[in-house]
């Protein structure tokens, strides 16, 4: 695997020097300062690329070129935003950047309820608490019809949890959910959030798939033409939330994508932490079935709790993800590619490290502090080395 590191640009508290010292050779970044829908110019791309290369690194993957909400709802100027997206892909290819991670999640990108969940060892992790999320949806957001998405027991527990919350607890929970997490391109006030949710009131899974298919049929031929590989990121969490449909959550969704636009430019980001939240997702089977189309990997693990819809970010080699088998399947796919004459390594980044040690004293991007990811990268690197020595050394 090609070892990479997500970097949020010049304002990231983790510097490119830190990234290089961690042992990564590639950088995963995006032009977050450009508004959603606007074209990334060659000049802006080259500026960022030069910054990365001056640090002795390579811009390996774009994460993400965000998709304008008009495209997802098929309203407004969606065709203009698609044309702009096509041009951005052409410009990236012109600059020698050929792997693009993106997602098609409505309204929100990844969602958590607690950004500072304290683990027994004192480090901090990200957590999604199903009951706290229900308390937000039922008692703060007050989304019509939300009760249908929860069991009677969850509704009762959410009411009890809400009753014990201080005003600061409610404000923090609201911020965590709607204000935008690192890498998310949108943040909302509560009223704006309600308005955005309302734009999806007539959009179910089938309709959102129609809109995604329209996007893919417009984008993938351009990507194919210029040599860009599109790598869709799964939904996080991988199930419907807030009454919104989710369409990149299962192996069946992956198969639908391939059948909809059967081009090798139409590929996947294997995010083990997102797909792995669902017990019915067999990560190794996903890699084996769609290995030739996996162009990027996010390696992390989550741990489901007593309520299986509640989970927190586990250490990279613990939790519900069998990281050994996952890495072995990825190495096997790379070995297959090499046997066919390609030295095409799959970029991997350690995802969502714990906030720990000296980083506990610093202001960090949730999930993206340096030391926790350094630890995760070192652990995964060791697993990969052991697998290669045991199974693939001559």
Curated annotation (Swiss-Prot):
Gene Ontology MF terms in the entry: ferrous iron binding; manganese ion binding; mannonate dehydratase activity
One of the protein's GO biological processes: D-glucuronate catabolic process
Annotated Pfam families: UxuA
InterPro entries per the UniProt record, alphabetical: Man_deHydtase (IPR004628), Xyl_isomerase-like_sf (IPR036237)
Keyword ATP-binding: no
Catalysis: reaction(s): D-mannonate = 2-dehydro-3-deoxy-D-gluconate + H2O
Alphabetically ordered keywords of this record: Iron, Lyase, Manganese
Pathway(s) where this gene product acts: Carbohydrate metabolism; pentose and glucuronate interconversion
DNA-binding keyword on record: no
Cofactor(s) demanded: Fe(2+); Mn(2+)
Enzyme Commission (EC) number: 4.2.1.8
Broad class of enzyme this protein falls into: lyase
Family assignment from sequence similarity: Belongs to the mannonate dehydratase family.
Job description of the protein: Catalyzes the dehydration of D-mannonate.
NCBIfam families in UniProt: PRK03906.1 (NF003027), uxuA (TIGR00695)
HAMAP family, per the entry: UxuA (MF_00106)
Protein name, entry field: Mannonate dehydratase
Species, as recorded: Salmonella arizonae (strain ATCC BAA-731 / CDC346-86 / RSK2980)
Chain's gene name: uxuA
